[in-house]
Amino acid sequence: MIVLHARDCDPKACTALRAHRMGLVELTRHPGDVPTGAVVLDPTVEKALSREDRDAALERGLVAVDCSWEHVHRYFGPLRRRCRHRILPYLIAANPVNYGKPCKLSTVEALAAALYILGFRREAEEFISRFKWGPAFLELNRERLEAYRRAETSAEVVRVQEEFLPDGL
């Protein structure tokens, strides 16, 4: 797993930096370091992550981008043509900063969710358990994650997601 890191955050609170210090992810500041064909978690696209992305993630890598919304295009733009951009479906954050907020996942939560959806449940559990609040993320989202994991395609993930969306969202 790779994190493209913009250094926009408080280093003491940054889950991506903590994961890197623990040896759980590679860290880079340059979009050119991201392998061609990698699966990039991208909140600005419409195609949902699904098990059909599993082989690409295994062969080319799974990438999260840790940057402020002000710099989204600076980091996602250079990757647009050469990587698979996928959005995560509806999930609830359990990190201390955004606990209970929908779609406000930390970088570590996003990577754990992606692993789970791609079918790497045990690896997702091991990865997120390294963070004090990690098991809470899995428990809060267990039903959703299991349903997304069972979906074969992006279209199926989107259909399943509809069942979990609150009214008005």
UniProtKB/Swiss-Prot annotation:
GO molecular function, one term: 18S rRNA aminocarboxypropyltransferase activity
CC annotations in GO: cytoplasm
Naturally occurring in which organism (per UniProt): Methanopyrus kandleri (strain AV19 / DSM 6324 / JCM 9639 / NBRC 100938)
Similarity comment: Belongs to the TDD superfamily. TSR3 family.
NCBIfam families attached to this UniProt entry: PRK02287.1 (NF002621)
Chief location: cytoplasm
Protein name listed in UniProt: 16S rRNA aminocarboxypropyltransferase
Membrane-spanning intervals of the chain: none
Enzyme class: transferase
Chain residues that bind S-adenosyl-L-methionine: 15, 65, 88, 107
Gene Ontology biological process terms in this record: enzyme-directed rRNA pseudouridine synthesis
Function text: Aminocarboxypropyltransferase that catalyzes the aminocarboxypropyl transfer on pseudouridine corresponding to position 914 in M.jannaschii 16S rRNA. It constitutes the last step in biosynthesis of the hypermodified N1-methyl-N3-(3-amino-3-carboxypropyl) pseudouridine (m1acp3-Psi).
